[in-house]
Amino acid sequence: MNRYRYESIFFRYISSTRMILIICLLLGIGDMSAMGLKKDNSPIIPTLHPKGNENLRATLNEYKIPSPLFDTLDNSYETKHVIYTDNCSFAVLNPFGDPKYTLLSLLLMGRRKYDALVAWFVLGRACGRPIYLREYANCSTNEPFGTCKLKSLGWWDRRYAMTSYIDRDELKLIIAAPSRELSGLYTRLIIINGEPISSDILLTVKETCSFSRRGIKDNKLCKPFSFFVNGTTRLLDMVGTGTPRAHEENVKQWLERIGGKHLPIVVETSMQQVSNLPRSFRDSYFKSPDDDKYDDVKMTSATTNNITTSVDGYTGLTNRPEDFEKAPYITKRPIISVEEASSQSPKISTEKKSRTQIIISLVVLCVMFCFIVIGSGIWILRKHRKTVMYDRRRPSRRAYSRL
C-alpha cells in the first residue's frame, strides 16, 4: 500500500508541475501581447485602423515618395546639430522649419484649406533612406498643423518603426535608446500645397544603452537620388500603420519593460545642442570619393552636381492607381556609405542573440513535452493498475443450490 501511496503523491506532483508550466507559458505570452511586445521583446507595430475612425483613408496615399533633395532657396534653414548623451531614454529630432508661418501666410491670403505631406529621411553618401511618410488632405489653416479631415497611413521603414515614432505634433521624430549606428544626417521634408519646407539635423550618439537595438542601419536601403523619380513605398517594403498613438505607447512600454528611462513627457531639452552648421553642410556630406564608381549610362549620377532641386517627378497629392506600375526602377548597385569598422559586430551579435533565443525556446518546449509525456504515461499506468487491483479484489460469485 505504501508503494501505491508514494506513486499517487508523485503523480500529483508531476500533474501540478505540468499545470504550473502551462499556466506560466500562457500568462507569459498573454503578458507580452498585452504590453505590445513580441516574443523577442521587440515592440509590435500596429497596422490596424482605429475602430470608428471614418476620416482615415488608406487610399489617399498613392505610395509615392518625394525626393529628399526637394528644396528651395527661400527656406534654407541652418542644420541643427544635437548630441545624444542620455543613453537609455529618447532622442528627439526637431530640426528648424516650423510650418506655422506657411499656414499663417495661407490664412492671410484667405485660404482656409490645405494639403500637406511630411517625410523623414536619413541621408548617406549620395543616397537617401526614407524613414517615414504621411499625407494629409482637407486641413484647416485655423487649426494646428495636422488637423485634417483626411489622413493617410503612416508609412514606416520597418527597422526604424521598431523603436521610433512621430510625436503628437506630427513633426518630431522620436527614437528610443538609439545606438551609435543611428548617428548621421537626417532631413525632414514638409510640403504644404506644393511649397516645400526642408530642414536638416545632424545627430551624434555618444553613449548607448546595453539593450539599444542594433542592426537598423542597412546600406541597401539607402537609395541613390535617381530612385526617387519613380520610387514608391512598395519597392522599399515599408509598413503602413493607422494607429500612431498605439505605436507610440508600444515603443514607450518596450523601453520601460527592458529597463529604460520612461518619461511621461518627452522633451527636446534632453538633447545637447551645439553650434549650428550652415545649410551647405549637406553638400559636403554628400560628396564621396566613391561616387564615380556608380555613374554609368543607365544610371543617373549620384553627385549633387547633376541633381536638380525639382520634385523629381513628384506632383503632390494624387490618387492614380495606374502610377503604381510606372515605378520599374530598382537599385541594382546600392551606394555604399562610409561606415565604421565595428559596424559589422552589432549585426553578428544580433544574429547570435536571436539564435540563442531560438535554442532556449526549443529546450523549454522539449522539457515541457517530456513532462507532459511522463505525466500522461504515469496517469495511464495508474489507471491500469487500479483496474487490475479492482478486478483482483472483486469477490467472485458462487452459485448456491438449494439443499
UniProtKB/Swiss-Prot annotation:
InterPro entries linked to this entry: Herpes_glycop_dom, Ig-like_dom_sf
GO BP, one annotated term: symbiont entry into host cell
GO cellular component: membrane; viral envelope; virion membrane
Subcellular location: Virion membrane
Topology of the protein relative to the lipid bilayer: Single-pass type I membrane protein
Ranges per topology, Intravirion: 379-403
Record carries keyword Transmembrane helix: yes
Keywords: Disulfide bond, Glycoprotein, Host-virus interaction, Membrane, Signal, Transmembrane, Transmembrane helix, Viral attachment to host cell, Viral attachment to host entry receptor, Viral envelope protein, Virion, Virus entry into host cell
Transmembrane segments: 358-378
Residues of the signal peptide: 1-34
Cysteine disulfide partners in this protein: C88-C209, C127-C222, C139-C148
Membrane topology, Virion surface segments: 35-357
Residues with attached carbohydrate: N87, N138, N230, N306
Main location: virion
Domain of life: Viruses
Summary of the function given for this chain in its UniProt record: Envelope glycoprotein that binds to host cell entry receptors, promoting the virus entry into host cells. May trigger fusion with host membrane, by recruiting the fusion machinery composed of gB and gH/gL.
Family: Belongs to the herpesviridae glycoprotein D family.
Name of the protein this chain belongs to: Envelope glycoprotein D
Record organism: Gallid herpesvirus 2 (strain Chicken/Md5/ATCC VR-987) (GaHV-2)
